[in-house]
């Protein structure tokens, strides 16, 4: 029997919001977590992705005493389109910064630039330098 679950991690558009009037649906931007038979698929990388990453990191740390014993974090991230509200959490997705992580990212070409170029600019460009 297949095991399938969906969790909405962010459903806001344009920008995240933190206000008591918005607690019912949360304040994070686009991010949906889908688990299919133990495979993690993430739809869009809005600010909801930050919590997904933190939870993955917690499981990773709990899985062994050191990086040699730990189970690598695995996920497939699908980016629907290159808009800021669909990428705001990407730079803060902690599994990206752990060398043993196995994160596959797929998305559309935008304005004749590849997804890799767009994400490189986001991660290493002047607006968010990680040296």
Question: Which stretches of residues belong to each language-model region?
Answer:
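Binuclear metal-dependent hydrolase catalytic cores
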Residues: 1-131
């Amino acid at each position: 029997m297949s095991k399938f679950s969906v969790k909405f991690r962010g459903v806001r558009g344009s920008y995240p919001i933190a206000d008591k009037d918005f607690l019912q649906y949360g304040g994070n931007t686009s991010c949906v977590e889908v688990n299919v038979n133990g495979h993690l698929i993430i739809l869009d990388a809005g600010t909801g992705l930050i919590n997904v990453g933190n939870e993955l990191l917690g499981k990773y740390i709990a899985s062994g005493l050191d990086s040699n014993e730990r189970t690598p974090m695995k996920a497939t991230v699908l980016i629907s389109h290159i808009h800021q509200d669909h990428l705001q959490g990407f730079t803060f997705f902690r599994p990206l910064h752990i060398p043993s992580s196995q994160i596959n990212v797929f998305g559309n070409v935008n304005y004749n630039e590849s997804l890799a170029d767009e994400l490189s600019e986001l991660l290493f460009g002047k607006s968010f330098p990680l040296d």
